[in-house]
Amino acid sequence: MRFQGVGLCLGLLFITVNADFMDDGVEVEDFSENSDESNIKDEPSSGTFKYKTPQPIGEVYFTETFDSGNLAGWVLSKAKKDDMDSEIAIYDGRWEIEELKENQVPGDRGLVLKSKAKHHAIAAVLEKPFIFADKPLIVQYEVNFQDGIDCGGAYIKLLADTGDLILENFYDKTSYTIMFGPDKCGEDYKLHLIFRHKHPKTGVFEEKHAKPPDVDLKEFFTDRKTHLYTLVMNPDDTFEVLIDQKVVNQGTLLDDVVPPINPPREIDDPSDKKPEEWDDRAKIPDPTAVRPEDWDENEPAQIEDSSAVKPDGWLDDEPKFIPNPKAEKPEDWSDDMDGEWEAPHIPNPACQIGCGEWKPPMIDNPKYKGIWRPPMINNPNYQGLWSPQKIPNPDYFEDDHPFLLTSFSALGLELWSMTPDIYFDNFIICSEKEVADQWATDGWELKIMVANANEPGVLRQLVIAAEERPWLWLMYLVMAGLPVALVASFCWPRKVKKKYEDTGPKKTELCKLQSKAALEQEAEEEKAPEKPEDVQEEKKPGEAEVVTVEKEVIGEPEEKSKEDRETLEGQEEVSKLSKSGSEDEMKDADESPGSGDAPLKSLRKRRVRKD
């Protein structure tokens, strides 16, 4: 049981440290066991990788790697946001093309949002518009929150092909077809999938939001790794959202969006009104109830305490606050500009007991009852809650194929963030999953291999965690010391001496007992030398004591020390001498009354010398 308890403690310590690593992103574990990253074998350092700009292997609508080092084809917005001050309404956020801060792949660059707390907007035209018909839509790109993220987004907008789209005027209200990507503020982590659906009768566009993903998104915002975001929308009205090529959300456009695509068949009649005689009161005051005669509604809730007395030393004429006598007028004070200077007020030190007009404290009025109200009873005329009648929805429609959205012709990023250095790379829009997968293999997977090759070992990770949390050093020491202590206690067990209860007197106590008995006998015999009967009677108690002690000592365990054995031998000899002396004295007493002194005295002398 002892080893089981220690093992349990070790397990709890390991779980605690491991959970701490997970929270800090020191070593983030994949949320799926079938991770593609787990299949990537250990590679050498990033300096041995040969990067080649990804090339699409099939038909695409848009690709961008930023490896050229310039923003050719991209247009910075010059628009201003509506309903905002001109100073903060402009899109003046800065964009740069840079390599990753960590785990760089030589030659691989990306688009980086550089400004903090500014509006950013940039867009590029597709090679050809995407028309929703009979081909899937696949949108894929990479994001790395290099400095983490406090509040901001990294989503993209697929701008609607309206015919009058001007990218320099791109702003938050520009018409889009799909908005997709990560967004975070506070502790709210989101992965947006929003599309604008056109009402076939009214022509009004309405935003439809896909249900939230089924996984915890926090690690993708905090681990400072490059993650791959993929959206797949199929002509059969199904969709999938993937992170790092693993599905995190899926469903249908008809059933898994809010609000629903199709409106209700019936709606409340807007012209229907509740009848005046409709009684929807579930409870009413009891009409038969009468206010009691002694009910006084005029009594106040609180009254002055008539038993209160003004404390002695209360100063009625003293103010509670006085000007600070130590305050001085500032040198730069101008009476013309600042007005007449007045010293700040402080509590009056003379008002320790109280100052000003004294008033007795207020107490609850025992006679107070308040306004009388009759008790409530069930309404006999209750008709229930009224609701308007239903009528057919004049705007009802049934869209069985919501995949047929408005075509789009440009991709844009319209973002605001409190954290800079958000990295974007390897955009692709296509219709074939194989094309997108190969694009990810040539770009994103290479970043992952470099990151894995540069990943610190277990010991280094433990040191990094302890540098951020010094208390982990103590846990490491405990975890390292416990196995050593267990091995030591198992291999070199401590010798436990068996303790016996000391039932007999010690050697010194035995000697004292014998000496005391002998002295008492000697004193009594000197007082009455002519009475051998008394000597015999007095000798018996001493003999009994010696015999008793002897029995107790003999009853001890055999594991006695040498000293104990010597004590036993001495006790036996003393007992024998005592017995022989007693017998001799008895015989001498029978022969002559005066002959018992010499043997007794010699016996005492011999016993004392023996001790």
UniProtKB/Swiss-Prot annotation:
One of its GO terms (molecular function) is calcium ion binding. The modification Phosphoserine is found at residues 561, 578, 580, 582, 592, 595, 602. Detected in testis (at protein level). Detected in testis. It is a single-pass type I membrane protein. Residues 20-471 are lumenal. The modification N6-acetyllysine is found at residue 128. It is found in: Endoplasmic reticulum membrane. One of its GO terms (biological process) is binding of sperm to zona pellucida. The keyword Chaperone applies. Residues 493-611 are cytoplasmic. It comes from the Eukaryota. Sequence repeats lie at residues 267-280, 284-297, 303-316, 322-335, 339-352, 356-369, 370-383, 384-397. One of its GO terms (cellular component) is nuclear envelope. Residues 1-19 form the signal peptide. Disulfide bonds join 151-185, 351-355. Interacts with PDILT and PPIB. Interacts with ADAM2. Interacts with ADAM1A, ADAM1B and ADAM3; these are protein-coding genes in mouse but may be pseudogenes in other organisms. Belongs to the calreticulin family. This is Calmegin. It comes from Mus musculus (Mouse).
